[in-house]
Amino acid sequence: METNLDGCFERVEKTLGSMIDSLAKNNPSQKLAEELLAAEAELSKSLKLLETHQNNNARLQQLRQETSLHDTQLKDIMSSLWNMRRELKAVPTTSNPPPGPKHQFTTSELLAYARRISRNTLPLPGVTNGVDMTPTQFSASLTEPEDSFRLQFQPTQTQTPTNSFNLSFNGTVSTPIGLSAPTPTTTNDTQPSTQLPPSQQPPPKTAPADDKLPAHLKPAVNPLHDAAFHPWPTEGQIRTGALAALQRLVDAGIEPRGYDPAEQERRRVAEEKARREAEERARLEREEAERKGREERERMAREREAARLRNAGGADGDGERRESVAVARPKPKQFTFLGADDDEDDEDEDD
C-alpha cells in the first residue's frame, strides 16, 4: 500500500514537472496533459483505497473490542449457569405436592368475611334519602325527595281540568299547573252569557300549601340526613372490634387460637376465690396466734401475781411474830385531811 502510494506520488510529480517545463518553453503537449490526468486519477484511486483500508482497520479494532467484551459476558453467563445448575441439583426433589391447604383460608371463610363486610360497602338508605345512586339517576338525585314526589304527580297540559287537579294538604282544590281558569269570551255579542250566579261560583283560588319539611326538622325525622358515608369501618369501630381484641391478646403474649374467654374468666374467678380463702386462712391463723400469745401473757401475769401474793403473805406472818415479842409502842397517826377538818369543826362548836 505504501509502495503504491509512493509510486503514484512520484508519477504525478514527474508528469507535473514535465507539464510545467513544456508550458515554460511555450510548447504545451497534449500527451503530457493526458499523462497528468491519468496520474491524478490513479492517485485518487489509491487514496480512496487507503481510506477504505483505514476504515476497515478501525472496524476491525472495534469488532475485536466487542468480541472481547462478548467473550467476557459469555464467560460470566456460563459461570452463572453452571452455578445455578449446581444449586438446582443440590435441591432435594419431591414427588408429591406438599400437604396442607394451598391458602391460609377456605372458600367458606372468604364468603363469610365478604358477607360480614357487605353492609359497609353501600350507604344506608337514610344517608341517600331514598335516592338511586346509579349513574343514570344521578341528575334526579340532586332534587329533594319531596320535590321528586311533587314532580312525579304533576299533570301535563294535555290533561283535562276535570281529572287533573291537585289536592293540597289543607283540603282545598287548586288549579292544575299549566292550566288557567276558563274566562268567558266576548267575541260574539249575541252569544248568551255563561256566567254563574254567586251562590254557584267556585271558591277563589288559593296558593298551594308548602308541603316541604323545614330544614331544621329534617335531622329530627331522619337522623342520617347529610351523614358522611365511608365504605370502610372507622378507627373507633376497628378498635372495638374482634381484630383489635385479637391484637390485644397477641400484645399480652396470649395465643388467640384456642383462647376461651369464659374459661379464662372462670379461672380468674377461681384464682380470686383461692386468694381470698388464703388471705382469710392467714388472718384466722394470725388471730389464733395472737389469742394464744395473749392467753400465755395472761397466764404468766397470773402466775407472777400469785407468787407476789405468796411472798407478801410470808412477810406479814413474820412481822406479826416480831410485834408480839417486841414492846408495844403506839402506832404513829396517819395524817389525813379529813382529821384536820374534824378538829376545825370541833373548835368552831366550842366557840
Swiss-Prot record:
Residue stretches of biased makeup (Acidic residues): 340-351
GO BP of this protein: regulation of transcription by RNA polymerase II
Basic and acidic residues biased stretches: 257-308
Region (Disordered): 156-217, 256-351
GO molecular function, one term: transcription coregulator activity
A GO cellular component entry from the record: mediator complex
Biased composition (Low complexity): 182-198
Keyword annotations: Activator, Coiled coil, Nucleus, Transcription, Transcription regulation
Coiled coil location: 30-68, 262-311
InterPro entries per record: Mediator_Med4 (IPR019258)
Matching Pfam families: Med4
Cellular location(s): Nucleus
Polar residues biased stretches: 163-177
Sequence similarity: Belongs to the Mediator complex subunit 4 family.
Subunit description: Component of the Mediator complex.
Role played: Component of the Mediator complex, a coactivator involved in the regulated transcription of nearly all RNA polymerase II-dependent genes. Mediator functions as a bridge to convey information from gene-specific regulatory proteins to the basal RNA polymerase II transcription machinery. Mediator is recruited to promoters by direct interactions with regulatory proteins and serves as a scaffold for the assembly of a functional preinitiation complex with RNA polymerase II and the general transcription factors.
Descriptive protein name: Mediator of RNA polymerase II transcription subunit 4
Organism: Chaetomium globosum (strain ATCC 6205 / CBS 148.51 / DSM 1962 / NBRC 6347 / NRRL 1970)
